[in-house]
Structures are given as structure tokens and as C-alpha cells.
Amino acid sequence: MQRQLRVAVALASLGFALAGAQPLLRADEKSSVEEIRKELLQLPYYGVFDFLAFSYDKGTVTLMGYAYHSTLKHDAARGAKRASGVDQVIDKIEELPVSQFDDELRWRTYYAIYRDPFLSRYAPGGGMLRGHRHRFGGGFHAMRLRRFPGMEPVGDYPLHIIVNHGKITLLGVVDTESDKTVAGLRAREVPGSFGVENELVVEGSKPKSTRE
């Protein structure tokens, strides 16, 4: 089934705390945003341990997020440049350091969350109805992304697990506050971490970031 792409881009540089109307995108700008999103989603090594977000403004794409795979940062910039209407790409993606300790922590956290009976339906091939996709858009609006304000997130996995020097950050979108709470608890139960930041957004509600 083809990906259903919903465009919810805010060009404001500040987050949801600022008041004011969201500028409307022209048809050609919307087309460019869709192409950028498609290029990033098709990156072969973009997965659950990475997180990408972007903004588009008058031909300039700004990329942010975290890259676990060694070539993802370069591939994301190259992919964004292929989209129509893109004149310049500013690549601010942070490359995560190579660390066996972090790798072990990533996989322990992955299994703790995606194999949990309460959360396993979010895993690829889990209990969701065929064709159901937790895509970023709609309830997970660009203006609501606390870590990257004004950026449009991209991803297939609903819960992305970022590990950096032993610190775990959960990014993504879930259905309910209970799902967010359980995901944070499971991550906190993983031995060896130096802290957990639960930045999951509950679809359709105002996000709350909690440090556990």
C-alpha cells in the first residue's frame, strides 16, 4: 500500500508557544514538501534508531535530527536536493557516536518497548489492522515538536529510540497517554541508561515532555 502523505508544515522558526497565524503554503511549495518527505522516507537505512525532521522555506531545506547509520546524514541531504523547488540544503543532522554500549542499550530498549504486550501493536507486523500507519502529520504537527520547533518530522516507526552516550530519548507519536506512559516506563526499566526523556506526542493532544 502506498504511503499516505499528509502535509502539516509550519514555517515559523519558533515553537507552539508563540502566537500568530500559520502561513499558508502555495501549491508548488506543498508539492516540494511532499517530494522532500518522500525522498527522506525512501532512504534505505533510515530506521527506528534515527530521527529526521525538516523545514522548507523559499527553496531552502533545513534538516535536523539524529543519524545512527553512518551514511544517513549524507544520504538525507542528497535526497532532499533531488526534490523539485529545492535550491539549498542546510544539514544540521547530528551523527550519533559509534559506541558498543549505546548499541546494546538501543536493542534492549527496542525489545523492551516493541515486545511489550501493551505496545507490540506499534511494531512492524504487529497487531494493527493492515494498512494502518502512524505517520507524522495531523495530530503530530510540526509546530508541536519541542526538540525541533517549526520542523516537520519524518518516519515510519511510531516510536523512535535515540541513544546518545547512554541517554535515551523517545521521539514519535502514539495513540493515547497510556501508551506514552508505558513506553517511558519500559525505557526506564532498561538497565544501564543514564536517563530517559520521553518526548512522545499523543496524537491530537498537546504534548508534554517528561524527564524520567
State what each model feature region is.
Residues Q2-A12, F16-E212:
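N-terminal targeting leaders
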